[in-house]
């Protein structure tokens, strides 16, 4: 697990580097599917002092199997998503400013241009609000459940992120670094959408044929973007 702990540590350290977190906000995890174990950031530990050895290993029930610290308070959300979506290898949660603003407004981040379409096939959805019962019960688990409810049967890697109403963004990918990459993009397109709608409040969504082209040339079966 040392290699995965190092990867998760490095991915967590990318959050302050890209301006996605303040203080100890945010967390990144990754899963070892063969062992059924998840590595995640410890709760409330400052990035400035955090080390790879501080990463916490939990099983799929959330029991700590390795580590001196308590795991992130959002661990149950991560685990619920890993259980539901076998294609996920890494998950990140932040409170990045612009993506969180869309979450607090209760609005999906609209697909307005090709930067968005290069990564997200359509709007980045916003979940419904959790009920008082859901919040007072197993809050973090129910956060995972409402994300799943919102995504439905969609392929999560085609929509590698979501904003949870009144809370903030979650993003995911094939591994921890990919998840952080998608979180960075989500923050950027959230900012772009806010600016664009401020310039033109009547701005419509990107044309569907242009969105399809940009997403499929990068992620489709005949993708030709980048190097092999």
Curated annotation (Swiss-Prot):
A Pfam short name: Aldolase_II
Coiled-coil positions: none
Pathway per the UniProt entry: Cofactor degradation; L-ascorbate degradation; D-xylulose 5-phosphate from L-ascorbate: step 4/4
Top-rank lineage group of the source organism: Bacteria
A biological process term (GO) from this entry: pentose catabolic process
Chain sites annotated for binding substrate: 26-27, 43-44, 72-73
Induction of the gene: Induced by L-ascorbate. Repressed by UlaR.
Entry's Gene Ontology cellular component terms: cytosol
Reactions catalysed: L-ribulose 5-phosphate = D-xylulose 5-phosphate
Keywords recorded for this protein, A-Z: Carbohydrate metabolism, Isomerase, Metal-binding, Zinc
UniProt-listed InterPro entries: Aldolase_class_II_sugar_metab, Aldolase_II/adducin_N, Aldolase_II/adducin_N_sf, UlaF
E.C. no: 5.1.3.4
Oxidoreductase recorded as keyword: no
SMART domains with a match to the protein in the record: Aldolase_II
Essential cofactor(s): Zn(2+)
Cofactor, how bound (note): Binds 1 zinc ion per subunit.
Record has Transport as a keyword: no
Binding site residues for Zn(2+): 74, 93, 95, 167
Active-site residues, record numbering mapped to chain: 118 (proton donor/acceptor), 225 (proton donor/acceptor)
Molecular function terms, GO-annotated: aldehyde-lyase activity; L-ribulose-phosphate 4-epimerase activity; zinc ion binding
Function per UniProt: Catalyzes the isomerization of L-ribulose 5-phosphate to D-xylulose 5-phosphate. Is involved in the anaerobic L-ascorbate utilization.
Family: Belongs to the aldolase class II family. AraD/FucA subfamily.
Protein name (database record): L-ribulose-5-phosphate 4-epimerase UlaF
């Amino acid at each position: 697990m040392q290699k995965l702990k190092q990867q998760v540590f490095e991915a967590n350290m990318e959050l302050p580097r890209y301006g996605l977190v303040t203080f100890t906000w945010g967390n990144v995890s990754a899963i070892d599917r063969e062992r059924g174990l998840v590595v995640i950031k410890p709760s409330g530990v400052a990035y400035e002092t955090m080390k790879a050895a501080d990463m916490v290993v939990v099983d799929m029930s959330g029991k700590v199997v390795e580590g001196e610290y308590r795991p992130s308070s959002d661990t149950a959300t991560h685990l619920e998503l890993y259980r539901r979506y076998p294609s996920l290898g890494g998950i990140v949660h932040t409170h990045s400013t612009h993506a969180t603003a869309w979450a607090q407004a209760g609005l999906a981040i609209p697909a307005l241009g090709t930067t968005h379409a290069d990564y997200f096939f359509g709007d980045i959805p916003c979940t419904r609000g959790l009920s008082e019962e859901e919040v007072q019960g197993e809050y973090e688990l129910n956060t995972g459940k409402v994300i799943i409810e919102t995504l439905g049967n969609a392929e999560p890697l085609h929509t590698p992120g979501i904003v949870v109403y009144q809370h903030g963004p979650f993003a995911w990918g094939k591994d921890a670094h990919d998840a952080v990459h998608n979180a960075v993009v989500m923050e950027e397109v959230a900012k772009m959408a806010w600016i664009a709608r401020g310039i033109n409040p009547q701005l419509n969504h990107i044309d569907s044929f242009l969105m399809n082209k940009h997403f499929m040339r990068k992620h489709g079966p005949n993708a030709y973007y980048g190097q092999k």
